């Protein structure tokens, strides 16, 4: 059972940041995972009054507030036009619409869960994150850092992507993914993000120049084989490492060929 001693609706980001520095204080997101935990929370910090539930479009990027629900990513015309529907595909298997109306971008990103579809896609898109204390950094850098206590304010998704694809393999439609794969092309360069390994998503690049001559069936297969050798896989209840390695090769090849179609 989750027990909360004190509830505070933060009046400012400064107040929320100060409160979250204490070890037994917790920031509330959608509370979908938090409520399932057996723990005692000293102070629950609610950010819902700070205007972080908006998606803002600027000349160079889309800015996603930390309290934006995942459902908004699924239905936002601008985000999905820029990514050829990848945002909608990245969340469509996450339980159901009611769940996605509650789950937040901030919870998905700050939690850095291995099974996170959203994190996989945002890494491929070279997103940046902005914190109250630590300031702005790349999402890739944040994922490599050890845990720290801070308030995530927003996620910045830069424009200019020439094509984006998101794919996942699941044992059943609304289950956690066995493997996730996102590919984005920008200025001729490719970013591959592989998640649910079952560890958190990581970014990979075409280090050998296998796609320098463009995407063909042969180059896509070569890139898929290269990545399947480079991405470390593990075992859990949903799949073994060997199976994930085979699935990785399939998803990368399919993703590249699909990326060429939407060019």
Name what the model sees in each region.
Residues 1-263:
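C-terminal structural segment of proteins
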């Amino acid at each position: 059972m989750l027990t909360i001693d004190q509830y505070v609706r933060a009046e400012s980001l400064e107040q929320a940041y100060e409160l979250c520095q204490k070890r037994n204080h917790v920031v509330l997101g959608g509370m979908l995972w938090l409520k399932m935990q057996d723990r005692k929370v000293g102070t629950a910090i609610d950010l819902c009054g700070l205007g972080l539930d908006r998606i803002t479009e600027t000349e160079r990027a889309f800015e996603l507030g930390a309290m934006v629900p995942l459902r908004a990513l699924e239905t936002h015309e601008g985000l999905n036009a820029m990514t050829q529907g990848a945002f909608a595909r990245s969340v469509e298997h996450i339980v159901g619409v009611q769940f996605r109306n509650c789950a937040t971008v901030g919870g998905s990103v700050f939690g850095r869960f291995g099974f996170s579809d959203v994190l996989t896609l945002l890494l491929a898109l070279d997103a940046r994150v902005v914190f109250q204390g630590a300031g702005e950094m790349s999402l890739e850098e944040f994922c490599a850092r050890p845990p720290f206590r801070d308030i995530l304010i927003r996620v910045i998704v830069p424009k200019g992507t020439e094509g984006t694809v998101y794919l996942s393999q699941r044992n059943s439609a609304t289950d956690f993914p066995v493997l996730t794969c996102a590919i984005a092309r920008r200025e001729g360069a490719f970013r591959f993000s592989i998640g649910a390994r079952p560890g958190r998503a990581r970014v990979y690049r075409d280090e050998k120049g296998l796609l320098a001559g463009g995407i063909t069936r042969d180059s896509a297969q070569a890139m898929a084989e290269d990545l399947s050798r480079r991405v470390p896989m593990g075992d859990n209840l949903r799949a073994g490492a060997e199976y994930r390695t085979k699935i990785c090769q399939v998803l990368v090849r399919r993703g590249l060929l699909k990326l060429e179609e939407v060019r």
